[in-house]
């Protein structure tokens, strides 16, 4: 319709109230980054399931690697590597910074439970100034620089590497896993806790965004951070190594690129364009079987052929066969 192939990528869920859903065009195909986003697109926008491909957030395992020392960040902010360091990365916006606020809130209790702990909180946004003021007040009460608010950064791999434990959600959590850090997965949409083998399936279902999980609470966060730092060095190493292997197995950049290329291939312009006319879209088993057979034969013969079906029910034909279809009596569309 627009004269060019159009593929979108869905990374989040959006407000669909009023006329908003009708103002959105998801293109000929959509790449979703998780199964729950795919279900959301089907439910809220009525997209055909066969037009949605699920991929992953691909992580650069060389950039986010145990080989990155974090030394530059440690020197910049005067962190003490002989004391525990917790790193956190997120946008400091009202709808994203709940866990950052909770970390600042529980800092005095963390200091009692884990003497000398340092919180390295990175990110900028519309509540950054407010949170920085709270952090400064907490530091004054503790009589030391317990909380470091870095503001917006581009060297996130260095921020992650500087910490012994990472707290965060979504892509930031995956990047920390790639760096072989133990990770507490927590964000505005929910709380997952210290990631390990027992939590993989649930975490993957929501793309590590915690959608549908219990809300993050300061007391739960305090307990899990304390428990994580009470683990032996070997136990934390094992958790970090497991997280990095999960990235290699399920979240590689190569996998993400392959998924996108496959979807782009589905919509690229073909050299030959074929229009099929018949008794299609009437839910007639015999004619539908013929259509399926012809379509399969064309596909096997050449990937340079684009097929458009003249159908009594174009939506039904698209859903059943993934083929482009137009109303059979609107000849000007041909």
Language-model segment annotations:
Residues 73, 79-100, 104-108, 120, ...:
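Conserved donor-binding/catalytic core segment of Leloir-type glycosyltransferases
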Residues 19, 42-43, 59-76, 94-98:
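Acidic anion/phosphate-binding donor-loop and adjacent secondary structure
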Residues 131-153:
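Nucleotide-activated donor-binding/catalytic signature segment of Leloir-type glycosyltransferases, i.e.
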Residues 4-35, 46, 160:
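A conserved, positively charged/aromatic
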Residues 36, 58:
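Carbohydrate-associated surface elements
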Residues 158-174, 180-184, 189:
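Acidic donor-binding loop of glycosyltransferase active sites
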